[in-house]
Each structure stands twice: as C-alpha cells, then as structure tokens.
C-alpha cells in the first residue's frame, strides 16, 4: 500500500504519527509525499480547540474529494478529533473508510484493514515504541516522555482526549534518546503535556531531574531542550542542573496563561502570581542567560480590564524571548464553558493589544542582542536557530556564510528585526 500522511497539531501528536508511520514502513508499505499518488490517505488530527477542529475537518473534506474522484481508494482518520468527537465525525463524514482511536494506532496495519470505527481504550502506561522514524529533519527530534494530564485546567480538553498522566519508564526514555543520537539527532526536545510532572505516576513524585541526569550521561549527546514546563513544578534543583551544563539549551518553555490571581484561580492553574514571579526570578538567578518562552490566554471568562492591564504590565516587566498569545476558546465539557463569557470583539482587541506590547519588548531585546555571541544550530546551510528558539514554533536566524545542517556552533548577532535575526558563524 502507498499511503500519504497528513499530521496535524502539536509535537506530541507528531510523535504518534512518527510511530505508526514507522510501523507501516517496517511492514513493507510505502510512504508517498503527494496525495494524488497514494492508495490511502491517513489523517492524524488535532481536536484541542475550535480552530484545530476546523482545520482537521477541512483536511478530511480534501481527502474525501480525492476519494470521490477516484484518485485515492481509502481515507483513514485518527487522533484527537476522533477521541473527542467520534460520533460527530462519523455523522458528518460517513464516507471515511476507517475511523480509529489513538490506542488503535499501535496495531495500525490490522486497524487499516478494518472498515468503520476501530476504538481501543487509552493505555494505562507508556513504553518504548518498537518502531520510530523522524518526520522532521534528521538532526532534531521530539522525545515524548509522558502523555495525558492530571492538571485539569478549566479551559483545557486534553484530559478528555489523552486521559490521565502516564510517564514512559526512565529506561525506555534513555533507550529512545540513545537511538536518536545513533541516528544523527543533535537536538532532542523533551515533550509532554506537562514535562515537569514526569515520573509522578511511576515513582511517587516528579523526577524530571533524575531523567535529565541519566540523559546527560549518554555518549554523543548534542543538546536537550525542555518544553511544556509547569511553573509550580519547576524546581531550583532542575534550574541548577540546567545552569551547570551546556548539554541542555538554556531555554525553558513555561506556559503561564495569565498573571492576575482571579483569572489564575478560575483557570485552576494550581499557582498564583507570587509563585509565578518567584519561579521566573529563580530561573534567571540559576541560569543567567536563560531564554523564556510562554503562552498567555486573553479574554478568559470574567477577565476584567484590571486583570488584563496587570498581564500587560507583567509582560513588559519580564521580557519573554518568545511568547504566544491566544484568544480564549469556549470548549464544551470544560469547567470554563459554564462561566460568564467575554464578547469576541473584546477578546480580539485584547489579543492584538498584548501582541503589540510583546512587539515592543522584542525591539528592546533585539537592541541588546546586537553584537552578542549565542549558541546556534543549523537547520540548513544558510539558516537555523539560536538556543533561544525551539523548532517549529520560534524564530529563525539567517547565516552570513554557509554552515552544514545539524552543526551546533557559536555565532555573533549582526542584525535583528522582530523574531528574525542574522548571525555570523564564529567557528
């Protein structure tokens, strides 16, 4: 069978795609990179928020149009949209050949032979996948250390989709990282819905620190990057370890979502403004050159003008290197769905205003960056990223001279505009 893959959503979903794609290839199937050349189209969907649902449905319509025209024979759909809205998807798209759950991806070859809906319960544990391939570049990869979430934030659908938090055993994570290194990966990004909770279900308490200590012993390790850290679980011991090694990029992705205490409480974020500030100050003390990335939600139910002004002031004060701004989406099944909603126009206005605040922050950061030396990684001969930039979501840098892809090197910043910078390789 020749198959064409459409993988949507976050890096966690991408790792699922990498695992079942590798299973298919190992069993003699062929992956093609043009939909029109495929026998079957497989769509791994996202269903996290309304915009992701719309994107997934648009891709399903596209695939079914090709099937109707006789260009492809089958269409299979899996992923978070299926977990969350399987009945709705079946009703809207009865022409789908196979609709299958995330758990059913583990036996994808058998699953695709079946017609209709193939559902399996989410596994109670994670383990080293028997097959794995990279759907990104050869020098950077995502390593999922856990799946699911126990935080139960009031706006979030992830626990309904992915289930409770389940860590991958430490030995399996280390083996997977070792395989990545042997295959030429230079940058390993550790991901989960909450990376800093790693191990709490297996070892009785979070143990990301212990995992990092083992990963740092791997021969040939390039760099690690930590994504999706929660502020109330980012410990001083973790920060000290990061600050003491050059094998972990001095970068922390730490989604904060808000800073006003009334909003944080309604969000059920398990921390308050004081704790957030203490965590950020601690990170800056223990890792003086730390680069912080975060996300904020504006227009959350009952967010007042005072709350929003506090958020703007906070963004100006802490000067995040990278920042995502999202308008609150009202999602059925979440605690926030029943709360008093804010008009769409107000949410849109506040999002634009916060983006403008961050734009001015970036201008200030860029002025300080000119002439400084940063660690960088090459994604192609003429472009890449600094340690301040994660794959896919952050900014890019252009090189003044070619550097082989996958090279980690020192570079001097020669110009900077917004999130785009030009650097001069130094070695």
Regions picked out by a protein language model, each given a short descriptive name:
Residues 194-198, 222, 231-234, 247-250, ...:
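Conserved radical SAM core fold
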Residues 47-52, 185-210, 214, 218, ...:
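Conserved glycine-rich "GG(E/T)P / GGGxP" loop and the immediately following alpha-helix
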Residues 303, 317-320:
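Contiguous mid-protein beta-loop-alpha structural module that forms a pocket-lining wall or clamp
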Residues 330, 338-427:
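Terminal RNA-binding accessory module
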Residues 205-223, 276-287, 353-354:
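Alpha-helix-loop-beta-strand connector modules within alpha/beta enzyme cores
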Residues 1-198, 237-240, 248, 252, ...:
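Proteins enriched for Cys/Gly/acidic motifs involved in redox and nucleic-acid/cofactor modification
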